[in-house]
Amino acid sequence: SVVQNSLFNRRIHTLTDIEISGPLRGNAAMVTKYSPNGTRTRGTINNCASGYTPWGTYLACEENWAGYFGNSNPGTRSSNEQASMRRYGVRATVGNGRENWNTASEVGQVGEPFSRWNVGIVGGTAADDYRNAANTYGYNVEIDPFRPNSTPKKRTAMGRFAHEGAWVGPVEAGKPVVFYMGCDSRY
């Protein structure tokens, strides 16, 4: 049965503070109003098949995440940025997102937590808005279930796509640890 007051009874969701790890940590593409230095992001979404690691953590895999985002002013993005957004499935307009979360802050309903779903350029710099928020999704999120106060980490070194899952391959002493991953994109 569920132990309601257990330290291990933990919820990780779209508002959880998450660390960005790996080669994209601190990269300009990860800078947002939430994390001006590009080392953190808010939340994880559409987590699919959880793989485990030999060291006792698990990997929650973000799949089909792009549809939650919308862009209030796509004409301000470079052609390369627009191509990248199309490739991943980020919507070119506001109001076309899966849940229309990207419209909530525009009408003044809820404010800051929902502003990040609008990847339009609305501030002077990337640290003033959420133009890069979509760049912080599409990764494997490592969670330590035995350290309830630990911060989940998005493992950017494992690549970015619509992760279906990540499972460790056969572990052999003296050899690199290998993970097998599946992509569950909907194009």
Where are these regions (language model features)?
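Conserved small-residue
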Residues: 1-187
